Regions:
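Bacterial Sec-dependent N-terminal signal peptides
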Residues: 2-4, 10, 16-40, 227-233
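N-terminal targeting leaders for non-cytosolic proteins
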Residues: 25-115
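Short catalytic/ligand-binding loop motif for oxyanion handling, primarily in non-cytosolic enzymes
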Residues: 40-42, 128-133, 207-210
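Secretory/extracellular carbohydrate-interaction modules
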Residues: 107, 121-137
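Extended extracellular/luminal ectodomain segments enriched in beta-structured repeat modules
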Residues: 115-122, 195-196
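Short coil-to-beta strand junction motifs in C2/discoidin
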Residues: 134-153
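Terminal, low-complexity interaction segments
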Residues: 153-233
Length: 233
């Protein structure tokens, strides 16, 4: 009798453990800028805006101080800074209408919610028309890129203001026999950054002068993908 009761008690305990065990699922969020209200051939109307789970802004209310705007510009031929809001592809990633334009120093936040902190998975990146044509044709300040030249954006993750990791993306690379000048949207693996609540962008180039980098410090971004583990009962 005692043996039977013991077996029954263990069975009930095991069932209770299984029934109380929490299950989880992976939720994916993609920031594609299509939810930002704006007109065709324009940029975001305010100095800060929200897309998906992320907050974007320009610095000190002026883009010349750096930051990120949402853009629907599609000019792939006009040279110079007056065309600073266009991607060289003429559209967002996957032929979408809107995308982000980063001018250094740029950053965005993706605050934790009731389910915790987001993990960043990937992002699509391409050149701005301004930077692309400057490297291709040269300008008053920048040179025509040739053997040995390069231009990159450094994407760095932070969690509670502590750096997690960084990923370098070459927007132009003429080293070691290569002749890459990015003109398409490229998907970048950012899983090395891990869990983040903010992301920053910095730029570097082989073309430097007395006052620093000559290459226009711009990049276009789209389809920022995050994942989050959610507990389900």
């Amino acid at each position: 009798m005692k043996t039977t009761n013991l077996i029954l008690s263990l069975a009930i305990l095991g069932f209770s453990f299984i029934s109380c065990k929490q299950e989880t699922e992976i939720n994916t969020t993609v920031v594609d800028f299509e939810d930002v209200a704006m007109n065709p051939d324009s940029i975001s109307k305010t100095s800060s805006f929200i897309s998906g789970n992320s907050n974007f802004s320009i610095n000190d209310d002026a883009f010349w101080n750096g930051g990120i705007v949402s853009s629907s510009h599609n000019d792939t031929v006009t040279i110079g800074y007056k065309n600073q809001y266009s991607s060289i592809t003429g559209s967002g990633a996957l032929n979408s209408k809107q995308y982000g334009v980063v001018y250094s120093p740029g950053s965005f936040t993706c605050p934790a919610n009731i389910n915790g902190t987001y993990s960043i998975k990937s992002m699509m990146v391409t050149n701005s028309t301004y930077a692309y044509l400057d490297m291709k044709n040269g300008s008053v300040y920048g040179k025509i890129f040739a053997t040995g030249d390069w231009f990159k954006v450094i994407i760095k993750g932070f969690k509670t203001k502590v750096p997690t990791s960084n990923v370098e993306v070459y927007l132009a690379d003429f080293r070691d026999g290569k002749s890459i000048l990015l003109k398409t949207w490229k998907k970048i693996d950012l899983s090395a950054l891990g869990q983040v609540d903010s992301v920053t962008f910095a730029f570097d180039s082989s073309d430097k002068g007395q006052f620093g980098m000559n290459t226009p410090a711009y990049a276009c971004i789209d389809n920022i993908e995050f994942t989050q583990t959610i507990s389900i009962k």
